[in-house]
A protein has these predicted regions:
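Histidine/acidic-rich helix-loop-helix segments that form or flank divalent-metal centers
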Residues: 63, 110-154
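Structural motif
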Residues: 36, 52-57, 129-136, 157
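Active-site flanking loop/helix segments enriched in acidic
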Residues: 7-45, 78-87, 91
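His-Asp-centered metal-binding catalytic motifs of divalent-metal-dependent phosphohydrolases/nucleases
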Residues: 57-76, 80, 100, 119-125, ...
């Protein structure tokens, strides 16, 4: 095992332990309850493996950390309007990036790799940063495959155009 691989394995284990604390549960592929953000992270990793199997390590880490401990920043902690939603999303980007960076430091990663992952998770440089764009592409594919129908079912006022 290389030094990088051992850091990678430690970081994934730390991300999974953090997401394993999620009190909200969803059904996993075997029908058993799985902490929601842990399941999401696993789905993200599965998708990047299918969509971009040779993705750089930083991108693989970023997709695993995309929603790390998301439940700690509830939507209703911001105003329940469009501006509040945008503030919540921006706050989440920073929260996820900082949390991922802290755990990566604990796993033994260097500052350059941590910064690269934080940029992607923090949604910086979308359309010009390949890691950020790949993260967004993978998130879109995961949404389509696992969440779109449920989301649409909760939004009967959404038209096809919307």
């Amino acid at each position: 095992m290389t030094i990088g691989q051992s850091c990678f394995d430690r970081a994934i284990a730390l991300f999974d332990a953090a997401n394993g604390e999620d009190p909200r549960m969803d059904k996993g592929p075997d029908g058993k309850d799985v902490p929601r953000e842990l399941l999401y992270a696993q789905r993200m990793t599965d998708m990047i493996g299918r969509f971009a199997p040779t993705a750089p390590e930083a991108a693989q880490l970023a997709v695993r950390a995309q929603h790390i401990q998301r439940w700690k920043v509830p939507r209703d902690s911001y105003p329940m309007d469009r501006d509040g939603y945008l503030q919540w999303r921006t706050g989440l980007y920073k929260f996820h990036a900082e949390t991922a960076g802290r755990l990566m430091k604990e796993a033994g990663y260097d500052d350059a790799t941590i910064d690269r992952v934080k940029q992607a998770v923090g949604k910086r440089g979308l359309k010009v940063n390949a890691d950020t764009q790949l993260l967004e592409d993978v998130a879109d594919l995961v949404f389509i495959e696992h969440y779109m129908l449920g989301f649409a079912g909760q939004k009967p006022d959404y038209t096809e155009e919307k």
